[in-house]
Amino acid sequence: MWRQMSPELRTAAAKAFWADEQAALEQAEAVALIARQIRFRPKSVMSLPVDKKAKHLGGIAQVSDLLAARMVIAYHLEHQRPMMGAFLDLLGIAHEDGLIKDEEPKKPEDATLDKAVKELSEKFPRQDVARYFWALLWQDPETWGGLKGRPELAID
């Protein structure tokens, strides 16, 4: 999914990622990746402003799956909370500003999921919905397995 995102969208995701205080491990991986890419020492990369680090990282299409997933999740938390909240509301899942309250949410019923997917796809841009569904599947394939194989996952 990361490679299919535009450089602008990847940069926005990377910027949100650098602000994520819980992504220290992935940020270290990103620093090493940028350092290799621009031939800087990691210490020099760490001292770059967030916008520069985000631009460098957003320009790299080939990153690890773990790093890509973390950036996509950070992007959603920063820029897509209304969509996240709308989907959870449609499913009747308790949340706080798009973040699920329950540590282990119950798998949605197929009929409820079908209806929620359809309604969300009508209210929000197709590409945004697809990226969100992929992020859910990556985070918790057991709970969100009902999203697999749906046409709404298609990213052009």
Task: Mark where each language-model region is.
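Acidic, low-complexity, intrinsically disordered interaction modules
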Residues: 19-146
